[in-house]
Design a protein with these regions (language model features):
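Glycine-rich phosphate-binding loop and adjoining beta1-alpha1-beta2 segment
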Residues: 1-9
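Alpha-helical elements of Rossmann-like donor-binding domains used by nucleotide-donor carbohydrate transfer enzymes
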Residues: 35, 47, 74, 96, ...
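Beta-loop-alpha module in the N-terminal Rossmann-like domain of NAD(P)-dependent dehydrogenases
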Residues: 11-76
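Predominantly a Rossmann-like dinucleotide-binding segment in NAD(P)-dependent oxidoreductases
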Residues: 92-163
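Contiguous beta-strand/loop segments that form the cofactor/metal-binding neighborhood of enzyme cores
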Residues: 145, 151-197
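Rossmann-fold dehydrogenase core element
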Residues: 72-92, 110-116
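Short glycine-rich anion-binding loops that position phosphate/pyrophosphate groups of nucleotides
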Residues: 42-43, 92, 193
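A short helix->loop->beta-strand "cap" motif at the edges of active sites that frequently abuts
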Residues: 10, 55-57, 82-85, 182
């Protein structure tokens, strides 16, 4: 993939302790590390971001930055103390069709409220519920694994949240309504094969 095509000589680690040791060695040899990119399971993001900041690096992290909202304030404090920055990646904002949609919405009538039905249904194998992704405490559930991409995109396009109601959530499915400045969205997310039409 990308690693092989562009970074065939990149160091690669599957154990955090070896990565930590390697970075310490680089730093002691006078080399500067500018960025740490966090692409680990959701429940490790907070700790890995803190690690990068304490190392003196800016940190690029996939979603979500933290699983629990009450953890964000202490992470912001660590960021301020480090004088480095944390950058979140939500890639749908960069998709050409999403950018085009946002441009069309901006050019639409300022008082128009859009009605949207968002249904995202994809099946996942048995592995899903046996991995960290199927463990609510480690993943944040379907809303953090899948929903966050859509909610970020919708907020980016249609404005701030006015009201949010989750009607149902279990380990495979979630349903609710989100009211934004320029849209009312009925949403349904599922990784359950039984929900595929």
């Amino acid at each position: 993939g990308i690693m092989d095509s562009f970074f065939p000589e990149a160091s690669f680690f599957t154990e955090f302790e070896r990565f930590d040791r390697y970075l310490d060695m680089i730093k002691r040899n006078g080399q500067q590390i500018d960025y740490v990119c966090v692409c680990s399971p959701n429940y490790l993001h907070d700790a890995h971001i803190r690690f990068g900041l304490k190392l003196g690096c800016d940190v690029i992290c996939e979603k979500p930055i933290v699983l629990n909202p009450w953890n964000i304030n202490s992470l912001i404090q660590v960021e301020k103390e480090s004088s480095n920055k944390v950058h979140a990646i939500l890639q749908l904002r960069l998709h050409p069709s999403i950018i085009s949609l946002k441009d069309r919405i901006i050019k639409s009538s300022s008082d128009k409220i859009f009605n949207i039905d968002l249904k995202y249904i994809t099946s996942r194998g048995k592995w899903y519920h046996h991995s960290w992704k199927g463990d609510y405490d480690k993943s944040g559930g379907i809303l953090s694994n899948i929903g966050i991409h859509f909610f970020d995109m919708l907020i980016w396009i249609f404005g701030d949240v006015i009201d949010l109601k989750k009607e149902f959530e279990d380990k495979s499915t979630a349903k609710g309504v989100i009211v934004l400045e320029k849209a009312k969205v009925n949403w349904f997310l599922s990784v359950d094969y039984e929900n595929i039409p």
